[in-house]
Amino acid sequence: MATNNTQNLRKSFAKTRSTVEYPDFLDIQVRSFKDFFQIDTPAENRFKEGLYKVFAENFPISDSRDNFILDFIDYNIDTPKYNVDECIDRGLTYAVPLKAKLRLTCNDKDNEDFQTIEQEVFLGNIPYMTERGSFVINGAERVIVSQLHRSPGVFFAQSKHTNGTKLYSARVIPFKGSWIEFATDVNNVMFAYIDRKKKFPVTTLLRAIGYGSDKDILDLFGLSEEVEATKANIKKAIGRKLAARVLRTWTEDFVDEDTGEVVSIDRNEVLLERDSIIKEEDINIIVESGSKSIILHREDVNIADYTIIYNTLQKDNSNSEKEAVEQIYRQLRNTDAPDEQTARDIIHNLFFSDKRYDLGEVGRYRINKKLGSGMGSEVKVLTKEDIINIVKYLIGLINSRAVVDDIDHLSNRRVRTMGEQLYSQFSVGLARMARTIKERMNVRDNEDFKPVDLINARTLSSVINSFFGTNQLSQFMDQTNPLAEITHKRRMSALGPGGLSRERAGFEVRDVHYTHYGRLCTIETPEGPNIGLISSLCVHAKVNSMGFIETPYRKVIDGIVDVKNQPVFLTAEEEDGAHIAQANAMYDDNGNFISDRIKARYEGDFPVIAPDKVDLIDIATNQIVSVAASLIPFLEHDDANRALMGSNMQRQAVPLLRPEAPIVGTGLERRVAMDSRTLLIAEADGVVEFVDANEIKMRYDLTDEDRLVSFDSDIITYSLIKFRRTNQDTCINLKPVIQHGERVKKGQVLCEGYATDKGELALGRNLMVAFMPWQGYNFEDAIVISEKVVRDDIFTSIHIEEFELEVRDTKRGEEELTSEIPNVSEEAVKNLDENGIIRTGAEIKEGDILIGKITPKGESDPTPEEKLLRAIFGDKAGDVKDASMKAPPSLRGVVIDTKLFSRPKKDKDLRIKSKKQVETIKGKYSKDLLALREQMIEKLAALLDGQTSQGVKHKFGDEVISKGVKFSRKNIEANVFPDKNPYRDESNYNVQEEANLLGDLIIDNWTSDKKINENVLRLVKNYLTKRNETAGKFKRERFTLEVGDELPAGIVQLAKVYIAKKRKLKVGDKMAGRHGNKGVVARIVRDEDMPFLEDGTPVDIVLNPLGVPSRMNIGQIYETLLGLAGKKLGRKYATPIFDGASEEEVINELRDAGLPTIGRTKLVDGLSGNPFDQPVTVGVIYMMKLGHLVDDKMHARSIGPYSLITQQPLGGKAQFGGQRFGEMEVWALEAFGAANILQEILTVKSDDVVGRAKTYECIVKGENLPRPNIPESFNVLVHELRGLALEITLH
């Protein structure tokens, strides 16, 4: 039975009904990755998405003569060589082998002997996501952060010229291809820009895409009236304006000197310009020009609206489509086009070719939505209609009939999830691979070759590895605590390739926008230069297939909330124009609002409206914020700036040795701990068979059907993580919370640890607090803490540091790990084993040898003294030097683990021995597979007993068991598991059993019973999984024997030492609450000196009351008082944000606990024993210890390293550097007239090389200090001036 020791039950103060479950908080990472690989989807059912789409876009590949064609059929991934833990230990990448099935065919009639070849080809090892949504790259966990960037599509903007004229522009941003921009200028002319550089009138572009004449262009906007060019008609038109030029056109013939051909060229001469008013004398000119008609301005249209078109036509020098395309070619290439077709092709390739230009599904959707065009989503290129509609929309903007876009609106920004980023990297890798395949095909003429001969696996894996290792969005995972992990995986960054840069990002893009509501957290963002550029996804938000962030709402129809149906998820664009009620608007069980006035949101406004005007309602009060901000109780009483700090500081809380869940929580603590994937969760109902500190064995309740299709044992073993180091050197150590024989329910937590307590997130401890000054020690946010907190290990944490040493093969010989180190005392090596590695359990301090290593010295002639010493003490000590790893300054701890990885020696006897061992494990592997096969035959026979076959087919179409035949053990064994697979070459496999037929069969509709077919599918899937696991294990064992541990080139051995440091709370450590109330421990006071309650209970912590009013984080006071009541009553509370306990409810809890309801208590001074004059706010507050520990920062230097050039001491603790005495500090000493101290600091303590050596000598001899010399920095200055040919001498 589940006991209360495995669960915290909380009293909730929530008033709103929240029937909607939280989504999986890691869904954005896990689902994106699964959708990219489509692992669980059979090849024939895969969507043209993710990896499958990349292959489809790059294949088929053919040579330049189309003789050979390489087609893509399918891809699959094998099991990884090492599991996640092994990769972390060995510093390897957790990756899976990617294999593609390719078909090579030949169309060359001269090469009829060539057989079509299908082959599975290895494309490289691809980093694979762990269950926790991270990647292990070179032994370190990393996260791919999602990127927020501008959505593809069309954007309309407005700017102002310096003279005050409004300028309008439209920019089309594609996924792939050239940008095109349309913009107006101060002269009211519209230009088109291609790739932000080449500019020409927009009418030139319109002519180039098929609207060649002035009449065609004017007709697009309904501006022209065509009149037949007769004398009578022209006479009637006298006094009206021409809308198009009157041209005289003729054809000229000339002989091409190169070819001798006669070539015709059309010529134009402008007789009358646009906007000319027709006069009497123009009649004959028009008639004689040979023009069939003239184009006049329409009199029924307001010409002023279209002035820009007329102005642009005036600027346009071209008169036909041919002239326009040639003019654009000249602009783009800075040279004349060789012929008209080349000029046309360049326009086509820029915007109308799907090979060069791609708007993507999103871009097409955005353009259709904006311009109201009805293009199908399959049209991924720009169309003529798009260009015309954009020009029309711009004219509408100029005439104030349309609105510009808000670039910060979330409909114009989309998320590039990890899957999409991988897609673009694979596209680059496969495009490179396609080029090399093409080159190799062209080289191989009529000779036999296979697909594997064309492919270089390194091409793809180098691109992918460089992305995971160096890309700005592939980040070292923040693993301080489970919340830090979850937040990092849910992060949205506007930085990175193709995004913003923090230098260029202005205030608007960083600011909160009304569309962020329910999508991006309005609170959680960094405080530094990245403020507003890095955000976090809200708790209920999700990213849709197009990359837009959606948030859920309940529909409200005629003032009644739809409580029966599931909420609808809406993007920012879909939500525009709707009145949305807040989640705390009360309604009854039928959905009728209780109040007749409802507070609502309408885009960026907040009206109070009648219920029947409401369209939607929020589903939860914490919908507006992220996971971290949702964990702050009484957030509604805190200033946003402090809440931001509270959110960020929870991520820095170090996991404690004895964590404790908060008394006052928000109800989300359990969900965060579960979704972090840190804890072990029961997969089904069952019983605990065995439990100890290292493992838990569970026997789950399985049905006979489940047992039949499973190959696993009934008992499942879970290993608990013990003292594992995280990326931030904190410690994961899990311990069981269930007991032997206990019955558990599905979803129940089996262990705790790593900042969790009974399945809930526990980042800190509940402490008895008093808000009062104490002897001035809590001035300026400093904290006074009781000795009891230190003594009882309340804030003690364990930190694990990893030290590694590589043994290399150098030019002078191989380095060696040993405990026999020259010139070192026996005392120093007493804890080293024979490999020179310190023993587990040894206590170490700074300067101790952790790993003993010797390196060969350079060969040089020894002096006579050395020869003598060698003769006496042996040859060993002379030719090697000590290269051991020593404990760095300030390190004190206990060795908890050591590891040694080695590459085996290439010895003949060892090779023979390992060959025998490989044969042994190969035999065992073959036996295991045969046993599995036998088990599978038994299970299939039992499942299909008495059933009639509906036809068991091979995927090539052959029938293996004919339709109508009854299944039996005999025909299953003979036909499904024959001794030889006729479709596969068994020489390609390790053992014959690997090539069995089952994997090639269509596992579909073997019988007429649907249920049995489903079970056959499950059974075959489980069998193939088990077979792959067995194969993976064999490959790993064989690899270990043949190759040894995988180590980088040139490294023979790798030794690792893990040291655990127990960090008790100290003066100087940083602590914080959840409301942005941070401070540094200033004094640890004895229990008896701390202020105490009237019953004698001393408080644990004293905070300064002045830290509350100016910071406006009153939430901490509410938390303090409710925490006090909870402690007295033995209750834990859930007070969800914006829906938590009211002032009255807090008072009621205090009353129930028999505590003063004013929230203040009489306190007694521990030092004097006298009561304080005024009552003090005393309660229980949740405090965390942050990662900024004084032990990591404390540093002192006596003698240390100097910079080579300036000869000044280095800076920083890592370099064992000094404290910089800067310009302002020098002023301070000058102001005091402390000349000698100043001289000493600027010379012998800094860069007076000779002076500091002499000073040391004088101190040793007890003499007076010498006069300082000239500092080295003066010499550096002199040398630099000499570089400018200026000679300076110092006297």
From Swiss-Prot:
GO molecular function, one term: ribonucleoside binding
Protein family: Belongs to the RNA polymerase beta chain family.
EC number: 2.7.7.6
Catalysed conversion reaction: RNA(n) + a ribonucleoside 5'-triphosphate = RNA(n+1) + diphosphate
Matches recorded under CDD domains: RNA_pol_B_RPB2
Description of how the protein assembles with itself and partners: The RNAP catalytic core consists of 2 alpha, 1 beta, 1 beta' and 1 omega subunit. When a sigma factor is associated with the core the holoenzyme is formed, which can initiate transcription.
Biological-process GO terms, alphabetical: DNA-templated transcription
Keyword tags: DNA-directed RNA polymerase, Nucleotidyltransferase, Transcription, Transferase
Superkingdom of this protein's organism: Bacteria
SUPFAM superfamilies the UniProt entry points to: beta and beta-prime subunits of DNA dependent RNA-polymerase (SSF64484)
Keyword Transferase assigned: yes
InterPro entries: DNA-dir_RNA_pol_bsu_ext_1_sf, DNA-dir_RNA_pol_bsu_external_1, DNA-dir_RNA_pol_su2, DNA-dir_RNAP_su2_dom, DNA-dir_RNAP_su2_hyb_sf, RNA_pol_bsu_bac, RNA_pol_bsu_CS, RNA_pol_bsu_protrusion
One cellular component (GO) term of this entry: DNA-directed RNA polymerase complex
Known role: DNA-dependent RNA polymerase catalyzes the transcription of DNA into RNA using the four ribonucleoside triphosphates as substrates.
Top EC class for this record: transferase
Regions annotated as coiled coil: none
PROSITE patterns: RNA_POL_BETA
Name of the protein: DNA-directed RNA polymerase subunit beta
Keyword Manganese: no
HAMAP family: RNApol_bact_RpoB (MF_01321)
